[in-house]
Amino acid sequence: MASGSSGGGYADEKGPGAATMQALGLQQQHGGGGEVEEESSEMGEKTAARTRLSGLLWHGGSAYDAWFSCASNQVAQVLLTLPYSFAQLGMASGLLFQLFYGLLGSWTAYLISILYLEYRTRKERDKVDFRNHVIQWFEVLDGLLGRHWRNVGLAFNCTFLLFGSVIQLIGCASNIYYINDHLDKRTWTYIFGACCATTVFIPSFHNYRIWSFLGLLMTTYTAWYIAVASLIHGQVEGVAHSGPTSIVLYFTGATNILYTFGGHAVTVEIMHAMWRPQKFKAIYLLATVYVLTLTLPSASAAYWAFGDALLTHSNALALLPRTPWRDAAVVLMLIHQFITFGFACTPLYFVWEKLVGLHGCPSLCKRAAARLPVVLPIWFLAIIFPFFGPINSAVGSLLVSFTVYIIPSLAYMVTFRSPQSRQNAVERPPRFAGGWTGAYVINSFVVAWVLVVGFGFGGWASITNFVHQVDTFGLFAKCYQCPPHPAAAALSPPGAIAPAPASMLPPFNSTAAGIFAAPVPSPAPAPAPMHFVLGHHHHHRHHRHGL
C-alpha cells in the first residue's frame, strides 16, 4: 500500500532530507578536500536536525496521531453546550444519550474505515498511485457505489463541514466575550473569521500532529475546570432540575448529543494521513472513550450546580464566576476552536482544490490563495446565524444524521450485498458483532433509529427551536444572548420590569402530554445563579456573565 503518502499533495516527507544527503554524498565522491567534507558533514547534521524537528512537530501519521486527531476533533465547543443539553433532557437521559450515541458513532466510524480500505485496496490493485492525492469520503462512495452515491455524499458532507466551521467561529465569539465584553459578539466574529482564515496554510491532516496534541490538552483542562468549578461553586439557591419540560426541548438536547459524537465526517482524511490506515479500526472507539471521561463529569456537574438556569445560558461558562482559572479555560478553548476550525475546513479545502485543478500543486502559497474563497461563506453564515447552542442541534438532526450515521450504514450494506463481495472483502465484520448477519442487523437499527429519532423528531424539535431564536433575536443579531449594558440599564425607568430571557422557549407542556410526567410549570428566569455570582464581584465589568 502507498500508505506513506503525505496526504497533502506532497510526495514524500522524507524526500528533502534524502535528497540533501544524496547531494552531499556526490560532493564527497568527486573530492574537494577535507574542508569540503567537513562543511558537508556540518550541513548534513543541521539538515538532519531540522528534519527530525519537523517530523516531531509537523509530520504525523502514526496511530497515536490519528487518535489525537479524532479525540481533539470530536470534543471542542460542543463541550460548553452539553450542560445546556442536560437541562433540556434531564440528568438520566443526558447520561444515557451520551453513552448510546458514543457507541453508535464509533460503529459507523468503523464502517467508514472499512469502506475506505476496500476502496483503496481495489484501486491499488489497478496500480493507482495516491501519493499526490487525498482520498475523500465522496470518492470512496463513487468508487464503490457510483456517481449518485458520490453526489449525495458530497452534498451532505460538504454542507455539514461548512456549518461545522460556522459553529466553531460562533463559539469563538461567544467565548471571548466572557473575558472582553468591550466589543459585541458580531465584531468578535469578524476578528476571529480573519484569524481562522490562516488555516489555509496547513497542507493536510498529516500536518496537525502538534495541533491535535495541544488541542486535546486544552479541552481536557476546560472540561475538568467546568466539573471542578461547578462542584466547588455548589448548587445555587433554589436550584431546580425540572428537565425535560417539553418534547421540543427534549429532542433538541438529544440531537445536540447526536452532533457531539458525529465528528467523523473527516474520518477518511485522517485515515489517509496515516502511514498504516489498517490500524484505524478501533481508534475512533478509543477516542470516544476518552471523550466521555471529559463530557460526562463536566456536563453532569454543571447541571447539578445550576439546573434550569442553563436553559437560558447555552454556554456553561456564562454561569461560572470570573476567575483566572475561567479566563484560562476561555483562552485555551479559543485556541482549540481555531484548531477545530481547521479540521472542519481542510476537507472543504481539498474539494475546492480538486474543483479548480490545484490539488496536486506543489506550491503551498498557490494552494493557500486558492483556498481563501472557502472561508468567506463560513464567515458570512456565522454573522447571519449567531445562535450558539441551537445551531448545533439543527446541524445534528439535518446533516450529521445522514452524513455520519445513515449514509455509511446504507453504503456498507449495499457494497457487500452480494455473496461474492462478502467473500472478497478486505475486512470481515468482527465476530462479537455477529459476523455479516449481525452487521446488517446493527446497520438496519442505526438507519431506522437515526432516521426516526434523530432526523424526524430531532429535526422537528431543532428547527422549531431555531426558528424561535430567529423570531426572537432576528438574523445578523449583534450580540446574541448578551445582557443589557450597564449604561443602558441605568437609563431605564425606575419601575420598569426587566423582560424575561428570550432564549427560553415558551412552554410546550401540552405537546408532551402522555410522553413525559405531569407538566412542570416553566421555571422563572431564576435569579439565584446570577445573584450568587454578582455577590462575589463588585466591579461592573466582572459581573456580566450572561451569554
From Swiss-Prot:
Alphabetized UniProt keyword annotations? Amino-acid transport, Auxin signaling pathway, Cell membrane, Glycoprotein, Membrane, Symport, Transmembrane, Transmembrane helix, Transport
Q: Which residues are glycosylated?
A: 509
Identify the Pfam families for this entry: Aa_trans
Q: Which residues lie on this side of the membrane: Extracellular?
A: 93-94, 173-187, 233-247, 303-329, 393, 462-547
Single Gene Ontology BP annotation: amino acid transmembrane transport
According to the record, the segments passing through the membrane are 75-92, 95-115, 152-172, 188-208, 212-232, 248-268, 282-302, 330-350, 372-392, 394-414, 441-461
Q: Provide GO CC annotations from the record.
A: membrane; plasma membrane
As for subcellular location, the record says: Cell membrane
Any one GO MF term held by the record is: symporter activity
The UniProt function text for this chain reads: Carrier protein involved in proton-driven auxin influx. May mediate the formation of auxin gradient from developing leaves (site of auxin biosynthesis) to tips.
Q: What is this protein called?
A: Auxin transporter-like protein 3
Annotated organism of origin? Oryza sativa subsp. japonica
